[in-house]
Amino acid sequence: MKTIEGFKLRKLGNEYILVGESMALINFNKMITLNETAAFLWKEAEKGSFDAASLCKALCDEYDVAPEKAMTDVVATIDSWKEAGVIE
């Protein structure tokens, strides 16, 4: 998988949002907000092609989290990104 080009992560106060930076990507009816963990995963995903296993490893390396819990969170995050249309 990979992120769709044109979506940028922005921090507003204590929250993170994904912003479509071209008119084709802007949907004024939907804002994609991310928590700190999902923002970390997005930054990892932006580095290139990724899968659940690679994001899980990055999450475990960065945070003190059990691999099983990390994989559950990563899969849920990827599913939400697919639903939002920000990855392919």
Predicted regions and their residues:
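Acidic, low-complexity/disordered tracts enriched in E/D and polar residues
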Residues: 1-40
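Long, charge-rich, low-complexity alpha-helical segments
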Residues: 30-88
